Amino acid sequence: MKTIYIWSLIVAIPLFGSMADYRKMKKINLLHTSEVVQDTINDIIDSNSVNIQDSSLVYSLIHVESTGNDSCVGDRHLVIPSIGCLQIRPIMVREVNRILKDLGNTTRFKNKDRWSRKKSIQMFYIWKNFHHKESTNEKIARNWNGGPRGYKRKRTLQYWEKVQKKLNKQL
């Protein structure tokens, strides 16, 4: 047993070294290829600068997700419910923090930030500007509702129709 354990350590050490090198390379690549995304994210964190089309999308999502209620708790049947005006789950908070870390930003969000409308909107824009810089409103909304491949799922079509209906009323 001990020899297997020692052998597994000897084999694992080079793997961790190469994984760390891979992460460094990935981070360097991200920093060089997405400076615009990083600048946009810094603007989002530092101020409230967004364009009108983006704001109409986020407010349509807020209306569909929570009808504007910042204290909304959804999916109570699940172990961890979605919280706030945009119905954010802890996994989205982790994803936003991962994005910020990859981009070299020291800002981090906590799960309790989901209760804040301003911070929820900031998290949404960070996610959107990183993953959906050039995506359509439909793809953004369907992925927000259904996860990374949400735009491919039939169940997100009804969600998109609700968002689109609210968007059309705003325009």
Residue locations for each model-derived region?
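Positively charged, phosphate-engaging catalytic surfaces used for nucleic-acid and nucleotide handling
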Residues: 9
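Positively charged n-region of N-terminal signal peptides that target proteins for export
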Residues: 1-4
